[in-house]
C-alpha cells in the first residue's frame, strides 16, 4: 500500500522517522495565461512564473522563459508586465490571489507538481515507546486531518470551477477550454 511504501522510504534513507500524511495539496494547475495555448510555440511566448528549482529549470530546458518569485509578488508582476503568465497552486488559492483579474485562460493539471504533502513526523524511538492506544489515537487523528483536508480542497476548488456557458459578464469570466467560470 501507499503507507507501506511511505514507511519503506524512511528506512531506505536511513532515518528513524514515523510519518503521517495529514494535508495533501494538489494537483496544481499549469497556470494562468493571457491567450489560449494550442501548442508549445504558444507556451514559449510567455515569461512564466514557475516554482524555483527543478520545476523552473525543467521549464527553461524546454524553452520556457521561467521566472521564480514569491506568491505575493505575482499579481503586481503581472500588472506591471514583468511576467506574462503565472502558476501558483490550484483554483481556490489562485482565485484568492486574484490572477483572474488580469489573465483569462486557466489550464488545470500542471507539469510540475502532482501533489504536495504536509506531514506530521515523530522519531521512531518516540513512536515505538507509545502505548497501542496512543499509536491508534495518533493514526486516527492523522487520518481525520487527511479526510478533512481532502474534502475541504475538493469542495473549495470545485466551487471555484463552477462552469457556466452563459456568463453574465464575459469580461469577468475565465476561459477553461471553451467553458467559462465567473
Where are these regions (language model features)?
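Positively charged, low-complexity/disordered segments
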Residues: 167-169, 174-182
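N-terminal secretory/targeting leader peptides
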Residues: 11-165, 173
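A gly/proline- and charged-residue-enriched helix-loop-helix capping module
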Residues: 2-9
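Residue-level preference for long, well-ordered alpha-helices that form the structural scaffold
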Residues: 1-2, 149
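Polar low-complexity intrinsically disordered regions enriched in Ser/Thr and small residues
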Residues: 5, 161, 180-181
Amino acid at each position: 500500500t501507499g503507507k507501506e511504501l511511505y514507511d519503506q522510504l524512511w528506512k531506505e534513507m536511513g532515518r528513524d522517522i514515523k510519518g503521517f500524511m495529514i494535508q495533501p495539496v494538489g494537483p496544481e494547475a499549469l497556470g494562468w495565461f493571457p491567450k489560449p495555448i494550442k501548442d508549445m510555440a504558444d507556451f514559449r511566448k510567455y515569461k512564466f512564473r514557475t516554482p524555483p528549482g527543478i520545476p523552473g529549470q525543467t521549464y527553461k530546458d524546454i524553452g520556457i522563459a521561467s521566472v521564480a518569485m514569491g506568491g505575493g509578488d505575482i499579481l503586481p508582476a503581472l500588472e506591471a508586465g514583468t511576467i506574462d503568465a503565472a502558476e501558483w497552486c490550484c483554483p481556490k488559492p489562485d482565485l484568492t490571489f486574484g490572477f483572474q483579474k488580469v489573465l483569462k485562460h486557466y489550464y488545470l493539471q500542471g507539469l510540475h507538481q502532482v501533489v504536495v504533502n504536509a506531514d506530521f513526523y515523530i522519531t521512531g524511538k518516540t513512536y515505538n515507546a507509545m502505548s497501542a492506544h496512543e499509536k491508534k489515537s495518533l493514526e486516527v487523528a492523522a487520518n481525520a486531518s487527511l479526510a478533512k483536508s481532502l474534502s475541504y480542497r475538493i469542495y473549495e476548488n470545485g466551487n471555484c470551477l463552477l462552469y457556466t456557458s452563459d456568463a453574465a459578464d464575459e469580461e469577468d469570466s475565465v476561459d477553461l477550454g471553451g467553458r467559462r467560470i465567473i
